[in-house]
Amino acid sequence: MLRGVVGAFLVSLTVAGSYAVASHKTVTLSVDGAPMTVTTMKSRVIDIVEENGFEVSDRDDLFPAATETVHQSDTIVLRRSRPLEVSLDGEGTKQVWTTASTVDEALAQLRMTDKAPAAASRGSRVPLAGMALPVVSPKTVQIDDGGKVSTVHLAAPNVAGLLEAAGVPLEQNDKVVPAASSPVVDGMQIQVTRMRIEKVTERVPLAPGNERIEDPTMNMSRQVVEDPGAPGLQDVTFAIAKVNGVETGRLPVANQVIEPARNGVLRVGAKPGTEVPPVSNGHTWDALAQCEAGGNWAINTGNGFYGGVQFDQNTWERNGGLRYAPRADLATREEQIAIATVTQSRQGWGAWPVCSGRIGAR
């Protein structure tokens, strides 16, 4: 008798254990797109969902259906509904319900994919408590993008959004009229000026420097290139400003020497007493030299007149020319102008009676 009771008890334990093992399962529960792994001994979809703390309303989407049986490794998907206060182009608001998690998904559910959110971005999450969703309808506008004109029919909350939707977003320092934040209206004309800074590297010559040697035997206004040196090569990076693709300026911002330049040698005059004052009214003296000597400051035809303004030897010497050169034709343009200025201050423009009149100097 006792042996029979014990046997029956063991059989019932075995059956109960087998049932528990068979009932225990691991499933995936996805709520509003967020999956989680749960273990359960429940069999119905609704029981597992509620067991994990989620309520299901008539507006929610639940798959499989609430009364369906769940098996090991199954997936349950719950998309909870949330209210939206939708208004179009700033007019009347109506409440709708959606199980979408993002604004973009909500517009798709509401069959409003041709509309655009006026405030939120398309990727914004829709909170479970709901949100206001003002949207705008498509508008027909003309875009002049740096001279390329096109007409588009798009929905966007403002000018910047419309340009982005059209595939030509504002970048860098681009300018747009009307302003980027302006609301889009039908028939609007948008003018875009593309302002770009581009970096370009070019290989260019590297100019040689000069070693200056002062020569006390040579007049101060003179210099002689003893050795011109040799240019090198460098890679220069320029920041190039462009307006609508047209270069408007460039500035070197970096360089790398590829081949160094060889410096030249410049011998400069340093002879005391040969200073030359700055040339004033140089265009007048050049015009006078053109009239007197065809513009040749070194002319000597043997007629007794020398240089660009045709000094005779007496005038050259009397007005201090010998400190520069024995004759005017052996002096530089600047040295001759210095002596001509002294001559003009003493004799007036009458020292050159014909040519001074022709050039309008008197």
From Swiss-Prot:
GO molecular function: hydrolase activity
Positions in coiled-coil regions: none
GO BP term (any one): peptidoglycan catabolic process
Signal peptide per UniProt: 1-22
Phenotype of the disrupted gene, per the record: Not essential, grows normally.
Domain G5: 192-272
Keyword flag Signal: yes
Domain of life: Bacteria
Entry EC number(s): 3.-.-.-
Tagged with keyword Transferase: no
Gene3D superfamilies: 1.10.530.10, Resuscitation-promoting factor rpfb
Keywords: Hydrolase, Signal
Pfam entry (one): Transglycosylas
Function field: Factor that stimulates resuscitation of dormant cells. Has peptidoglycan (PG) hydrolytic activity. Active in the pM concentration range. Has little to no effect on actively-growing cells. PG fragments could either directly activate the resuscitation pathway of dormant bacteria or serve as a substrate for endogenous Rpf, resulting in low molecular weight products with resuscitation activity.
Family indicated by similarity: Belongs to the transglycosylase family. Rpf subfamily.
Protein name, UniProt field: Resuscitation-promoting factor RpfB
Phylogenetic classification of the source organism: Bacteria, Bacillati, Actinomycetota, Actinomycetes, Mycobacteriales
Name of the encoding gene: rpfB
